[in-house]
A protein has these predicted regions:
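Structural signature of extracellular appendage/secretion-system components
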Residues: 1-531
Length: 531
């Protein structure tokens, strides 16, 4: 009766936890009782039944597969979400003004002025289209940079979550070992530990090793122990790692990208182990965030030298801005009026006959000397000498009045004398022609040779391909996680039909045992009366 009562109690507990997240159904082992005493010649019927151990019905392979698929889904989800946001920046269609549409409008507007240089309305349109282009470039770059900053903050939040989870795992490890050492089942604690392992897998990929005492160690892919028996190692997010030997490279927003580390030292004398690359190359949401945000080597000097898809996208916008500041501005100056001098003398002029400045069509906010070499021509060397890392953030239009646009060129080049015919649109024609001319676009590790349209279309194609791939990866990962979850539940979760059938079976066995005892009692009473 005691055995059947225990079986009924276990079935009741399973039914009560049918909707408990992470609960693995229990089974009670029942064994035939072995009689240690044997008598020769005596028929041995048996000694009844005894209770064995309470077992959690789990499958290690399924549990590991579920965590692995959860980690893949975590990474794919982050990548799909953030790439979906960035994709709209490079859209070829839609109501919003993009860098691509603004470039087309700007060059088309200049082409119109080339046909009628004296028309103030057309010149006003150039100003409007130029401001739209500047706004589009600055806005696109800033949105990418802000996304990088947001991901940096998300990584810090994920690390806080990882630290809390590993701390709880270490506590459960200790409790499980203590309980099982006394022969008491720690099934509930093991269920809670599996839940925490699944939660941890959503953030980061790791391997586990169960020890004979019931504790589990968790290791990162490089072997670093996140949890070692009853000890959890706390990860840190820092922008001042001890392994940096000089100034750290800037982020796209001008700040510092954080590093995920473990401090073997103290707060006063830190000794950081860099785990950022290990986490980035793994799975989980933190891997997806790091792959998008990028990793900056401490030896880098520019935000565009970091890896990461967001850095690649921002570099394309930055390269367009730098080409506008150098190649386009250089063409805007016109041929040199006096090649015999070391300083370029512009042949282009506005409606008042004034020549444009070195950064006359597109400019940038900087209080120091912009023409560092003093040769009168804008160049990448001039930009580099300013110490500014990103010009897309501070790009501006180089003129503020419509008559200041230099549409014509000197009709009779003579040093010190500039004559611009009223209908001369040669300079505007030269600028408009640059739309279809091959340019060299450079920013950080990015180098692209082609026209403005080819550069932008390549950017659209790259971002679209990344988003499509991320969507496919997410769909596959989500489906794999769902299938694995179903398989795990089929093996480990509570089936009400099965438990109800067990209740009926155990109840009948209990009733039969009770009737047997009652029958034995009746027989004993009858024998007593006869005596």
């Amino acid at each position: 009766m005691t055995a059947q009562q225990a079986l009924l109690a276990n079935a009741s507990n399973n039914i009560a936890n049918v909707n408990t997240p992470g609960y693995s159904r229990r089974e009670v082992d029942i064994l035939a009782r072995i009689d240690p005493v044997t008598v020769d010649g005596v028929l041995r019927i048996g000694s009844g039944v005894q209770l064995g151990e309470i077992r959690r019905i789990t499958n290690t392979f399924l549990e590991n597969s579920l965590r692995a698929s959860g980690a893949k889904q975590g990474k794919a989800s982050v990548r799909n979400e953030y790439l979906g946001r960035v994709e709209s920046i490079f859209s070829l269609s839609g109501p919003q003004v993009t860098v691509g549409s603004a470039l087309n409008s700007f060059f088309s507007s200049i082409n119109q002025v080339a046909l009628n240089p004296a028309d103030i309305d057309l010149r006003l349109d150039i100003m409007q289209r130029g401001e739209e282009l500047v706004t589009a470039i600055r806005g696109a770059y800033q949105e990418i940079a802000d996304t990088q900053t947001e991901l940096d903050q998300r990584i810090a939040q994920d690390i806080d979550s990882i630290n809390a989870t590993t701390r709880d795992l270490a506590t459960l490890n200790s409790g499980i070992a203590q309980k099982e050492a006394t022969g008491v089942s720690a099934a509930d604690e093991r269920d809670q530990r599996d839940i925490l392992l699944g939660k941890l897998a959503e953030k980061v990929s790791f391997k586990t090793l169960e020890l004979p005492n019931g504790m589990i160690n968790c290791y990162l892919d490089n072997g670093f122990p996140l949890v070692s028996e009853a000890t959890a190692r706390r990860l840190e997010v820092t922008t001042n790692p001890s392994f940096a030997t000089g100034p750290l490279p800037p982020s796209l927003n001008g700040g510092i990208l954080s590093y995920v580390t473990f401090n073997f030292g103290s707060d006063a004398a830190p000794a950081h182990l860099d785990l950022t690359q290990t986490l980035k190359n793994g799975e989980g949401s933190i891997a997806g965030a790091l792959q998008l945000r990028g990793y900056a080597d401490t030896a880098n000097t520019s935000a565009f030298e970091a890896d990461g898809e967001l850095v690649q996208m921002a570099a394309r916008i930055e390269a367009i801005a730098r080409t506008l500041l150098t190649s386009v501005n250089q063409e805007y100056l016109g041929p040199d009026e006096d090649p015999s001098t070391a300083v370029h003398e512009p042949s282009a002029g506005d409606l008042n006959g004034n020549p444009p400045s070195v950064f006359g069509l597109f400019d940038f906010a900087f209080s120091g000397t912009k023409d560092a070499d003093g040769n009168g021509l804008p160049s990448l060397t001039d930009l580099t000498s300013t110490g500014i890392d990103s010009f897309a953030r501070i790009l501006s239009l180089g003129f503020s009045q419509p008559e200041q646009f230099a549409a014509g060129r000197d009709s009779n080049p003579t040093a010190g004398v500039r004559t611009i015919a009223p209908g001369d649109g040669r300079n505007a024609q030269a600028i408009a022609a640059m739309r279809t001319q091959t340019q060299s676009f450079m920013a950080g590790s990015l180098t692209f040779t082609g026209t403005f349209d080819e550069m932008y279309n390549s950017s659209v194609s790259t971002v679209g391909s990344l988003k499509s791939s991320a969507q496919s990866e997410y769909d596959v990962a989500r489906q794999a996680f769902t299938v694995t979850s179903v398989k795990r539940d089929e093996f480990s979760s509570v089936s009400l039909d099965e438990e109800f059938a067990n209740v009926i079976k155990f109840q009948k066995a209990f009733q039969a045992s009770a009737r047997m005892i009652r029958t034995a009692a009746d027989l004993l009473e009858m024998i007593t009366r006869l005596l």
